[in-house]
Amino acid sequence: MFDYERLEALSIEGEAPQSEPERQYYFMKKCRQWAEEEKERIGHPLTMSIQTLGCQMNAKDSEKMTAILEYIGYKEVEEPVADFVLYNTCTVRENANLKIYGRLGYLKNHKKKNPSMRIALCGCMMQEVDEVERIRKSYSFVDLVFGTHNIYKLAELLYTQVQSARPVMDVWKEAKEIVEDLPGKRKYPFKTGVNIMYGCNNFCSYCIVPYVRGRERSREPEDIISEIKGLVADGVVEVMLLGQNVNSYGKTLENPVTFANLLRQVNEIEGLKRIRFMTSHPKDLSDELIEAMAECDKVCTHLHLPLQSGSTEILKKMNRKYTKESYLSLVERIREKNPKLSLTTDIIVGFPGETEEDFEDTLDVVRKVRYDSAYTFIYSKRTGTPAAAMENQVPEEVVKERFDRLLHEVQGISAEITKGIEGETVPVLVEEINTQNEELLTGRLSNNAVVHFPGDASLIGEILPVKLVESKGFYYMGEIVK
């Protein structure tokens, strides 16, 4: 829970402090002072629209930026146009970049009508030099551009832009320090993500993440535990431990700590009910972690274990550092200790050089592991990655046919697994009012499956026994057991 008293106690007379996070507190207060004057000038409260693309870590970053802007004096609106529009970008797939350019085109005319409007871009796409140069040349109406390493400097960058009345572009190649003690606005009051590390050292040949998120950097376990205790005191019952590869946690610390050890420490926090984590790289998932998952009673019965391909040959080209056989052996060890564990995965179809035999290996793993669900993707060429320069790009029609076959296989298995616990009564965390039917609530099982059931909004945030009355393939219809 953020200490606003510490923020309010800081003086903004004189020069800005050099140390963080005090420097950012200074600029948050300076911006707040400006926002009061701006509100009087334009004759209405300042509004903001924050749109987030990509992963859970981007969502967590957006929570921080939302809270900073709210403190400054902006009110969040649902509309895509506001006095301050911020896009927190993703660049894992080329389509995400194209989406941003489309939205910028839409905003251009609105900015002409409202010169006081400010447009900001941050996140992974901004770490790509070519994209930033394109924005500089063709989208000069954008006011703020910053990357993944200085998200925490939002207030300082905004104040610089306000004072100079010129675009500010500040993208760092690497992180200089980890700054976490900033406000955050949780989407749900009862659950949230907690960053335990940043960056990635794996350099999978198709992936741009290490280039845009930087090398691995772990937070000190004491800081993580302290943050979670504060969140629990503020009503949080479930945390998601976040990192590009949580299994590598602690390796860069002065006093190394394993992720399994951290998990055991988090499990001891009084008042916390559920622990989730993502993402896990198979090559780093240790027997120590398998033991910890089985023994820690608060760890949810769900593991996301990206496969990407079932072909050892393709995995080698992907630089995944495991084989089909070692992956299946890992799953066997996991299931031996955690027989009720739900496994989900990521699979890429159409990686350069993928043959029919390679694809059949992927289907073979899917059938043997029997994933509860899978995120399936058609390979997307990312400029700057080794895979983009590989020969033997798979024809589009072949990829589409394979993708459909994979989807059919995954969906069939998923429906069978979901049907398997139909009729059981299980603990469910009530998350929200159903978006399709206001008379229903939506909740999540420990295994990450979703169930919809009749109930009152006052139950949101509670963990209740719910009977899974009917399986609908990818979700359940249920009823509260009283």
Question: Where are the regions that the model predicts?
Answer:
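Flexible glycine-/small-residue-rich
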Residues: 52, 279, 307-309, 430-432, ...
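Proteins enriched for Cys/Gly/acidic motifs involved in redox and nucleic-acid/cofactor modification
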Residues: 1-249, 288, 303, 325-336, ...
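Conserved SAM/AdoMet-binding glycine-rich loop
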Residues: 116-121, 130, 233-356, 367
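Contiguous mid-protein beta-loop-alpha structural module that forms a pocket-lining wall or clamp
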Residues: 354, 361, 369-371
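Terminal RNA-binding accessory module
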Residues: 10-13, 389-482
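Conserved, mostly hydrophobic/aromatic
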Residues: 204, 224, 241, 277, ...
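Short flexible coil/turn linkers enriched for glycine and charged/polar residues
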Residues: 187-190, 200-202, 299, 309, ...
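Radical SAM enzyme [4Fe-4S]-AdoMet core and its adjacent flexible, acidic
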Residues: 55, 250-267, 271, 318, ...
